[in-house]
Amino acid sequence: MKTYLFSIPTKKTDETSWVKPLNNYLLSIYGNTTEYQSDLEKFDKLRQDIRGVNPDNTGIKLYYNYYSQLELLDLRFPFSTVNRHKKVNFSWYDAFQPSVVHKQTALAFEKACVLFNLGALLSTYAGAKYEEAQRNSSIAAADETIKESLQIFQQTAGIYQFLNENFLHAPSNDLHQASVKFLVKLMLAQAQEVFVLKVISGDLEQNKNSLIAKLCQGTTNHYTECFNMVCNINKSGGGSSHDDFAVTDTNESVDDILGDDDDDDDLGDYNPEKSGEPQVTASIDSAWVATIHFKVQFYESLSHYFHGLQLEKNNKYGDSIAYLTKSQNILNEISSATLKAISKSGSNDSYELLDNYKYQKDAVGIKLTEMNKDNDFIYHDIIPSLITLPEIKPMDGVKTIPINNSKLFNDLNEYNYSNFFNNVVPINIHELLSFYSEEKSQFLRNELDLVDVSNEESASILEYLKMPKSLVNLKEIMNSSKHVDTMSTSSETNIDPGVRSIVNEVSSKYQTDMSNKDHISTIRKEIYNTITESESNLSGKFSESLIKYKDDLVRLKKSLIDASNSDNNLFGLINNDNSHLYAILGKGADSPEFKMLFNVDSQTSKKQSNNVENEISLLDIDDSQLSSSVNATDSIDSKIKSIEDILHDLNSIKNNKAKLVDTLKKEIHNDDISDILILNSKIKSTNEIKTVIFPEELKKFDPYGKELDNLIEQEKTFINELKNQWANLSDDPKVKEIQSSKQFQSNLIKHQTDKIIKFYNQNWKKYSLGLSAGVDFYNKLLAYARSLKQNIATAVNAPPQSSFNENFSNLNLGPQHSGPRAPPRPNQSYRPSYGDQSGTPQYNASHFSSNSPSLNHNLPPQYSQSSLHRSSTGGSFASHHSNESPGSYSRPPPALPPKRPSYSAQPTPHAPPQAPYTQFQPQASNYTDNSSSSANPTNLPQHPDSGTNDLIYNQPSTYQPNMYNFFSSN
């Protein structure tokens, strides 16, 4: 059985250019449209291509693609802004009245027309598939094609359903809501019809009569709804001028086609005012109305016919005859005008309907005659009244398929979203994304705060319990208690590596320091002997030329005394309190003596020897005591293992939290809902997006929050268990006993370490450096003493001078000086720092004044003119000569008292120079550099070159014989 299917006509359109309006908008926003030119050209070409497509896969794909890009254009471009400067005009012609054109600048009008044409193409394509199935000789291929046709009809209904729900104010009759709704019902009716015919043609054994009856009744209902919406079309015979739907006799009205009221009493059932259906405003062809009316009656007749066949199978012959009679009556009610209108529709398939009508009318008549005959002669079943027959329940086998469920449309949407103006994002979407980013950040901050608080709580508890250090120490103690022989070894391993390096440094210089100390004592004794011999040579000699050597000897001796005092303080750094420690450290870190410092056994040997008598003999210990000790140790080990497992679990939880937080950060960073916001920006307000979409999108992160909460709860459980088990372990008597011995060992190691470090910093470093500096100092002092001794011997053996006046006249004030060098002073490196030890002489090379050139002659660089000034404190000496040339040894004349008149006529002997150290007062305080009191003395005699008019030799003499008895003792 074959039927006639309607194909919706397409709307024609005029050419429209998209390039310039969109390019102007992009130029005003982005300033450069180079990257968008390709999309603009393709989009404009696609608009031109849809004007002449065929109803096939290619044409349908072009329309799907164009509509998809229109939707994206509406989402990415504010069309009101695009139309502000250069308006885009859309011209579309009415599908049922091609002469009527409608022009709009609204993008919604363009989308509605495109959807209408897409549905029209699909309806034509579905009809073509149905025709293909009828021509196909292969049953399997025909069935597959029929299924495809059914699918397309339902998709067409879905497209018109979407158009009906989203475009409410249509400017044309064909886009009016009633017209579009009529097309939805028509496509569903045709899909149901194709499905019914497929079931009928496949049920050769008539096993599905009941199902077919219900499906036919459903088809009747669909066409009834369609007819109710078009039965009021202009009864003057006006119809569409479209060629496919032209009616040959245009003078026939709908009343003529459907029959007079007398011939068709059922027209009252189709009163549109009673049905409540909206009336179609489009100019539907009258042939459509006639065909729809015919199908209403034809499928209602089929429904009663197949229901009667089913009753016959159930041996209900009376009821079967009644339904067959009703089926025959419905067929007879089809007016001749309706059949005439169908025959004049100009379509070849319309004749199939007339053939089906004739065939079904004959089949019902033959079957009804047979049933009446059998019932009259055999069954004698009562035939019920036709009015009392129950209604047949309808069944729908089809439904609308939404446009969003179309695989082709979804694929094109996905492709276009990533390739069609994908970089164009409206400003309002950027603002919404900023709000959403803040929501995500707040969610992340809340989770991070929970993690940080849990980590801090866990860390504080572990710190309070001193975990895991306390557990590690306890394990070491337990292992040490099991292996007593390794106690000393474990003590050695606990020694600070810094202490070992200190000990190695002390031991490496130990022999050198001892040698330097002995060398200092030897040289000091030799210097003293040299001074003694020099003094012996000068004893009893009062020559004026020897006075300067006596001064040098005094300074040399004073330097030796000061250096000796400094040596005593230096040697005092190693005293009876630390000499034993110094001797042990001098043997190195690997020596047994050093290791014994940290050995607990050696430190407690006395205590143990005193308590030997209190120890229990091994012979007195029975097996039960040994067994209880072993069991206690095993119990402690198991508790330690349990605590270790808890610590491992806590660490794993912490790592899992960190990993989960990192994953959450990445997910939040990569989360992009711009697509969702763009797609919903047209159908939801900003407030709805914030209050509905944002919370819904944030739910995707809830699993991370729940997982973090679970980890935190597990962490709290483990921490409570850890506290309980650690308290239980700490209260164990065996653990307390072992911890006390370990504490003694730790205290011993700390005490010895502090003692060694203190000795190293406060004693040995100063001691070693002082010895090295002292050796250098005494070597130079010895060289000076030997030189001075030789010069004295030469001067003593020299012939005496003639007279005082001759000596005075021959006094050499030039730069040459042949006398011995001044004794060196202890330099800076040989002046050890003793902290607050007052009264200790300290030596510094800077105490020698640069104003004493006689002391600087031939001295090493460190005792040159810039460093040989000696302060007036601590009994030190300084020379107060000024303005002398380097290398000379010229002394100013002493400030003699005025001459007395009684001695004016007598010759006065030459007075020896004044001793330089008479200007200073020795003190017991520290020897410090006091340049203010020694560098510029105020009452010193002036150099002879400083002013000849002020020389004392031109003044009256006040010489007294006993005023220079200072040297009489020498």
Curated annotation (Swiss-Prot):
Pfam families (UniProt xref): ALIX_LYPXL_bnd, BRO1
Name of the molecule in the record: Vacuolar protein-sorting protein BRO1
CDD domains, alphabetized: BRO1_ScBro1_like, V_ScBro1_like
Record GO biological process: protein transport to vacuole involved in ubiquitin-dependent protein catabolic process via the multivesicular body sorting pathway
Residue spans of biased composition, Polar residues class: 827-845, 862-880, 920-957
Region (Disordered): 254-279, 803-957
Residue ranges with Acidic residues bias: 254-268
Organism, scientific name: Debaryomyces hansenii (strain ATCC 36239 / CBS 767 / BCRC 21394 / JCM 1990 / NBRC 0083 / IGC 2968) (Yeast)
Gene: BRO1
UniProt xrefs under PANTHER family: PCD6 INTERACTING PROTEIN-RELATED, TYROSINE-PROTEIN PHOSPHATASE NON-RECEPTOR TYPE 23
Functional description taken from the UniProt entry: Involved in concentration and sorting of cargo proteins of the multivesicular body (MVB) for incorporation into intralumenal vesicles.
Bias-annotated ranges (Pro residues): 891-900
